[in-house]
Structures are given as structure tokens and as C-alpha cells.
Amino acid sequence: LLEAFMSTHSLIPSTGLGLPIARMRAVFQPAEVERKLHSLQAQGSDKEHAALCQTYQRMLERGPERFAVKPSGVPDMASLYDQLPNFTEPLDDVKRHVALSHASADSLELTPMLLLGPPGVGKTHFARLLADMLGTQTSLVPMSAMTAGWLLSGSSSQWKGAKPGKVFQALVDGEYANPVIVVDEIDKAATDAQYDPLGALYSLLEHDTAQSFVDEFAEVAVDASQVIWITTANDERQIPKPILNRMNVFQIEPPDADASRRIAAQLYRSIRNEHDWGRWFVDDLSPDVLDLLAPLPPREMRRALMTGFGNARLEGRDHLTPDDLPRNGPAKTRMGFVQ
């Protein structure tokens, strides 16, 4: 496991942190899983609950140990501040928590945060960059697309097609005891008279109760106390007060023109470095291309840049020009019958 960790993280871009420090932490108790499995087998219910038995067997085969990572020192984070100029306050909060865990046996414990702001200001982008900096993985839970209330906490194994929730999957099927879980657009969670889609968060956002979180499918306790929670929303009025009170709330404003240019420049370099084909292109964007990208939200910037890279490649150029970028927002392809 440690060799796999070192192999994975030797390629993480430098942010002034060095390699993360990894400790092993048990995310469940094997004895409890064994009892549940033996109980099903003794009752002759192993065929009826085949998916549940397979889950227990998979847990026992992998074992309970997962990486719990934290930066090896107090971070410089200059690169992140440059890439996320409108996220100064949440980055400051992260830096404080990292400083507390530095040079101690304590694990990194971040207070759950709510990033409040209009669509397209880079809230989910922030979460991914934070996970990269900390050396852990990201799991996205899109509440606006939720079709059932059990997405976070799983559904009872009594139901047909039941399966574990996102928290269980991130911890048991993932590599880390402290993944970043992003609950996206928490204010758009559908309300249901039979099931509160946010109900699981009441215990998950509290460190003490999260230590023994029980997924409704697996019905065994998992330790979710190390999860790094980031929620995003456009309207805090739609979020229950008890959940708001469990989080640090940060208002994220759209970046100004100068900050938007820096974001576009960083995003260009990031995309270029992420792909093998990036070696075909020059290191930086020209000022006229930056001028066109700056008014766009980060999400649209990325789409525009990908279009630009493709058009430049088709023309055999190693740089993007204004003509490579899409005009008048995202293009829509018309389909229909030819008359």
C-alpha cells in the first residue's frame, strides 16, 4: 500500500508542500463485518442478500486500513492563491488547520465549509485543487441531480437494486480515510416527505458522531470523522439552520478582471500539463486570448480552452489565437432532417 501511495504522489505538482505524510487508519472494524456476514450465512440468507454478502466479503478481503494524509509542513500555497484569487478566505482557513496539525501526531481536521456564491465562480474547481494539495482523492455528490434521498447514506438492502451510499463507497472502496467529499448545490436537494436527503449530514458533519456512521445498506459502522467536507450553494436560505451551524460559511464573489486573467493563464498551463499533447503548445497564452477568456466563468473558460487547443492543432499551430476560441458562448449543434 505504501509503495502504491508513493508512486501515486510522486507526480503531484509541487505547491510548496513536499510529499504528504501518510498514516494508516482503520475505517471499519473487521470483527463487526464478520459477525454480519456469518449471521446472514447462518440464516441461509446469503443468496437473498447476495449483494450485501459480496460487500462484506470485499471489505474483509481489502481490510480496514486506509491512508490518512496531511501536508508534510505548513504550506506556502502561493500557487493556490494565484489560481484561486477569489478564495482567499477559505484558503486562509485551510492554512490555519494545516498549521495546527503540523509537527504533531494529530491528523488534519478541517471544519466543514460551505462555499456560497453564483454558479461558475470555481467552487468545485477549488475542491479539486484542495484535494490535490492535501494528497487525497475527491468524491462529488451532485445534490441537484439527486433522484433519491439515500445517495449519501445508502439504501436498505431489503430493497431491490439497493447499494451503499457515497460516503461508504469513498471510504471502503477508496484509498483514503480522509477524502474530500464535495456536496454540490446542497441548496437544491429535493425535499421528500418520506426521506430527508440531507438527513445523514446531521451526524456526518459532527466529528464525534461521524466516527461511527452507519450506512443503511451495509449496516456496519464506518469512521467518517476524517472526511474533509466541502459543500456548495447559491442560496443559503434553502439550507436548514442546523446544517449551516455545522459549517464555516464563505461568500465567494466572481473574480475581477485582473484575477480572471490570472485564472485563465493558470488554467491554460494546467490543461497543457495534464495532457501528453500539451507538449505541442507554447508555455503561455497571448494577451489578446487572455482578454477574450477573462469575462468567462472558470467552467466556461475550460471548455473554451479545449476548443481552442483543438482548433489550433487542426491549423498546425503551437499557440492559440482569438479565432480558435468559440464565439458567443457554448456552441449548440443543430440536429434534424435535411429538407
Each PLM stretch: what is its role?
Residues 66, 175, 236-242, 253-319:
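Conserved C-terminal "switch" segment of AAA+ ATPases
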Residues 71-116:
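Pre-Walker A (pre-P-loop) alpha-helix and adjacent loop at the N terminus of AAA/AAA+ ATPase modules
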Residues 315-339:
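C-terminal engagement/docking regions of AAA+ P-loop ATPases
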